[in-house]
Each structure stands twice: as C-alpha cells, then as structure tokens.
C-alpha cells in the first residue's frame, strides 16, 4: 500500500519543483530589476553559465566576446552585471561623497577575508590600511632598498648559472616568482622563503599556484547555498587542510617576528610602529591574516607582470631593442640600477604600462562590488541596490572603442604617439582605484623596474620555440595560471 501512495507524493514534489523553476525563470526574465539589461537569456535566469565561465580558464576572453556583442554593460547573472566602460570603474570603486555608503565587496567572494584588508568592512578596512601604509610609504621603500638589491643580485647570479651561457632555456617566470616571494617574505617577516637558494617553491607558494582552479570553485560554491555542502565534496581532498596549515604558518611567522628584536625596516615592524603612533590596535589574528594576504598579493602579481613583459618584448624584437638601448645607455654598471634611477626610464615605464594593459593581474573578474542601498548610476546606467557589478578590465583594455589596435603591444601609445590620441589611457587602472586600491602599487613598480632593467642590461633575450604560444596558453582562475616561459638568456 505504501508503494501505491508514494507516486502521488513524488508527483506532487516534482510538480512543485517544476512550478518553482517556472516562477524563477519568469521572474528573472520579465520582472527582475535587471530585466532590461542586455545579455544571454540563460545568464538571466541562472548563475550556472557564469560559474562555468569562471571555471573554464577563459573568462576574460568570454567576457570580451559578450561585451562586443551586447555593449558596455552585460547581464552575466540573474543579479550580476559586467561593465567594460572606462567610467564604470570610478563610479563603482572610486571615492564616494561624504555620507554616501560604499559599494562594498561581494560578501560571498570575500567570505574568508573578513579579518584582513581584502574583505573587511569599510571601518575595519580604514583601520587596516592606515596601519599597513607605514610599510608601503616612499620612505619605507628607500629604507628597504638594500633588501631589494640583495635579492635582485641573487636572482641574476642564479640566472647566469642556469642559462649556461645562453645555450640552455630557462623558465624565467619561475625565477621571477622565486625572487618576489623571497623578497616579500623578508620584507614582511624578516626572513626569506629560500626559494632562490633551493631552486624550488616553498609549500606556501606552491599551494597558491596548484590550487587556483579549486579556489575559483570555492569562490563560486557560496552562490548555491542549498547545495553548497554537496558541492564542497568535490573540492580535492586535503586542500582545506593545506589552507589551514598555511594560515598556521602565517601565524607562526608573525609570532616569531614579534618576538624578535630587530632594527630592520620590515612590514611587521612598520605596522606595529604605526599602530603605536596612532594609538590604535590590531588583533594578532588580523595581523597574521593581513601578512598572509601581503605575501601572495605582493609577489605573484609582480612576477606575473614581469613574465608578461618579457614575453611581449621577445615577441616584438624592435620594442625589445629600444628598451635595451635605453637601459644600457643609462647604466655602465649593474649595481647602479636602483629604485630611484629606474623611475626615469620613460620607455621602460611605457613597456610596463602596456604589459599591464594587455595582461592585467586581475583579468577575469571574480571580485564584484555590491551596489549600495538606494542604487547608483554606473556609466550612465541606473543600477538597483544589491546588484553585483564586475568591472572587467581585460574586456575594456581590448575593446577597439577605447584603444586603437588593442591586441597589439605598442608602448608608444603611452608616450604621446598621435596614432593613439583617442585611447582611454586613463581607464587602465590595474591596481584599481579609490579607497580600496592596491596598497602595494609602489612596491610592485619598484620591483618590476629594477628586475626588468637588470634583465635587459645583463642579457640578450630570445624566446624558446616551446613558449611561442605562452600568451594564448595562459588561463585565468581568479589569478593567472601561466605555463612555463622558457627563454634563452645570452650574457652580454
């Protein structure tokens, strides 16, 4: 008898579920506040296409295609818009007028970063930033120059060893990463990760690169609260354990640094010094969490941009020749290449800016903002409150409406060349803008200028045949997932 009574129950459940889906589809298509924004109809009714996009490795290219089809604003999810208009960045992420609420970070995207500068609320972010600012000031950069130079010298010693006089290809991307992680470890904690010494990644570093896909997946799980526990079962076994181990490692390093008396001007010392002078405080877990963020953000992005710059230079021999001449005519000795003098290399700055345009560290979205109460105008469009808004840098940087020959690497566009007079160079903000822009921008530029100048001063560079498609083979899972960049480094 139970078997006969089960079918009506199943039919009722199925009918109810189907009715619910119909209601959701009809509402999202015809009654949702975003119903009038253009975009694929499937994206309007479910978050699944966007999630698959974020996990495919090519969200930047897919978003560009959507903007080419639908225009400067695209509905990429039931409650999510993507803008590639130059004015949208300022409207969403720029400074707000006094009394206006902030367009805050998407709670789901930053749910594990509430105790650091990445995901904290407005009040705590201000507190964290004021404390961290001491370690990133111009004066702090100059005080840390001996540390910069020591690691740059070690890098080029190792590159000379690895290149075998230019006869053996070297994965320069890997060596840049070794250097930036060692450098930021020393600047943050007063001790290196020893990547350059050991010619290998520290476990902390390797986890960041090996788990990019899983991190992108974890970031999307929260958008499906009803089935999140089941989706979590798909995360590789042991990954969460490794995350916990890295968090504990950060705590251990911060505790060790706090227990060590030193006059070296590292970040932890500068932060604690700044907290004392301001009469404010930071909990230990907050200090450790912020230090952990600085390690990844202050190293991976710099190494990525340097790798992109070297690739584009090798792919454009004339541009490489112009940069080489600028550097070698400026310096007679390698040790003269320093933080201050490299700021005067105009063509190098143009090369770095063009590399940042074509290979921005944040290329595929993944960091939306939530429109504040009352809604707001974004690039001339009124966007309702609680809408998630992406500012898609890559889709903007490659849009011919804003950049002439957008797919071509041409540093001259940054040097007043009349061919590019209408380019929206003001829209290239790879370090974001507003109160939450990247606090480490000056550090990144200092590292990039010194290392790239030294690279072209020390070596003639030639791309290995196996890395000809490095750019096309790069993938994005929150951050860039790069293949090896093998080059021949021929000593001068």
Curated annotation (Swiss-Prot):
It is a single-pass membrane protein. Disruption phenotype: Leads to the accumulation of isotrichodermin, a trichothecene pathway intermediate. GO terms for cellular component: membrane. Heme binds at residue 438. Its EC number is 1.-.-.-. SUPFAM superfamilies: Cytochrome P450. Residues 88-106 have a biased composition (Basic and acidic residues). Belongs to the cytochrome P450 family. Pfam families: p450. It comes from Fusarium sporotrichioides. Trichothecenes are sesquiterpenoid toxins that act by inhibiting protein biosynthesis. Glycans are attached at residues 124, 198, 290. This is Trichothecene C-15 hydroxylase. Keywords: Glycoprotein, Heme, Iron, Membrane, Metal-binding, Monooxygenase, Oxidoreductase, Transmembrane, Transmembrane helix. The biosynthesis of trichothecenes begins with the cyclization of farnesyl diphosphate to trichodiene and is catalyzed by the trichodiene synthase TRI5. Trichodiene undergoes a series of oxygenations catalyzed by the cytochrome P450 monooxygenase TRI4. Pathway: Sesquiterpene biosynthesis; trichothecene biosynthesis. The chain crosses the membrane at residues 6-26. PANTHER family: CYTOCHROME P450, P450, PUTATIVE (EUROFUNG)-RELATED. One of its GO terms (molecular function) is monooxygenase activity. The keyword Cell inner membrane does not apply. Induction: Expression is positively regulated by the trichothecene cluster-specific transcription activator TRI10. Its cofactor is heme.
